[in-house]
Amino acid sequence: MAAQIIDGKLIAQTVRQEVAARVKARVEAGLRAPGLAVVLVGQDPASQIYVSSKRKACEEVGFISQSFDLPANTKEIELLALINELNTNKEIDGILVQLPLPAGIDTTNILEHIDPEKDVDGFHPYNVGRLSQRIPKLRSCTPKGIITLLERYNIPVRGKHAVIVGASNIVGRPMTLEMLLAGATTTTCHRFTQDLEHHIRQADILVVAVGKPHFIPGDWIKEGATVIDVGINRLDSGKLAGDVEYDVAREKAKYITPVPGGVGPMTVATLIENTLLACEQYHSD
């Protein structure tokens, strides 16, 4: 029997509606709407599309969105000055710096200068550290979005074997921490992992984020597993494909995310959720 499709678009829309209702209640109570600053450096086409979707999502839920589009030749010191300004702006609850940044700008330095209480991407070492200590506040958007999908579909995590393929700072590493927090036994696979197939065949929950189309053969999937495909890759044909061989995996898995329409929409929805959380918990004066 083919797997049940995990509809990320539907769940993301539900999350946005929930946030919009809370924002409406805030405003009706005389409180200000949450504010999100979106910073884009350069004119990378993919980044422009992502930023546009984030700004649109802000407007839909009633946030105040401030846009800062900087030229590609912006110096690091100039970007840091803007971040420092936004850190002290009491009407800004979240600061989002769209990645990747142009060559010559130290991404780590930029992200570490964002006030951790405005780090709605969840990338700051302080917030990742809180997650590792089981006291999370602002959590990385894609991993948290995946946890939301599992929760909304009532897919059990506690006591299950979760295998994460990919160890990036944006997805793989915080995803491992999220799975630990949820009570899973976790295995994280990366480029030095030997016998990848062996690990994947053990996975009750498989999360793949490597950025290579059809990297995981579908017949490696354990019968009845949950497959979360974070990859989004454009093929020569123009079609989008995930990191997992979808058609074959779907016949073995119990649940599976499609590409597109699975994890992607949840990343933006969680960003919106984080911004409201930052407003309510840190800046609601």
Swiss-Prot record:
Domain of life: Bacteria
Its EC number(s): 1.5.1.5, 3.5.4.9
Biological-process GO terms, alphabetical: L-histidine biosynthetic process; methionine biosynthetic process; purine nucleotide biosynthetic process; tetrahydrofolate interconversion
Entry annotated with the keyword Chloroplast: no
GO CC terms, sorted: cytosol
Keyword terms: Amino-acid biosynthesis, Histidine biosynthesis, Hydrolase, Methionine biosynthesis, Multifunctional enzyme, NADP, One-carbon metabolism, Oxidoreductase, Purine biosynthesis
Pathway info: One-carbon metabolism; tetrahydrofolate interconversion
An MF annotation (GO) of this entry: methylenetetrahydrofolate dehydrogenase (NADP+) activity
InterPro entries given in the database record: Aminoacid_DH-like_N_sf, NAD(P)-bd_dom_sf, THF_DH/CycHdrlase, THF_DH/CycHdrlase_cat_dom, THF_DH/CycHdrlase_CS, THF_DH/CycHdrlase_NAD-bd_dom
Binding-site positions, NADP(+): G166, A167, S168, I232
Reaction equation(s) it catalyzes: (6R)-5,10-methylene-5,6,7,8-tetrahydrofolate + NADP(+) = (6R)-5,10-methenyltetrahydrofolate + NADPH; (6R)-5,10-methenyltetrahydrofolate + H2O = (6R)-10-formyltetrahydrofolate + H(+)
Ribonucleoprotein recorded as keyword: no
Family stated for the protein in its record: Belongs to the tetrahydrofolate dehydrogenase/cyclohydrolase family.
Function: Catalyzes the oxidation of 5,10-methylenetetrahydrofolate to 5,10-methenyltetrahydrofolate and then the hydrolysis of 5,10-methenyltetrahydrofolate to 10-formyltetrahydrofolate.
Subunit-level organization: Homodimer.
Protein name: Bifunctional protein FolD
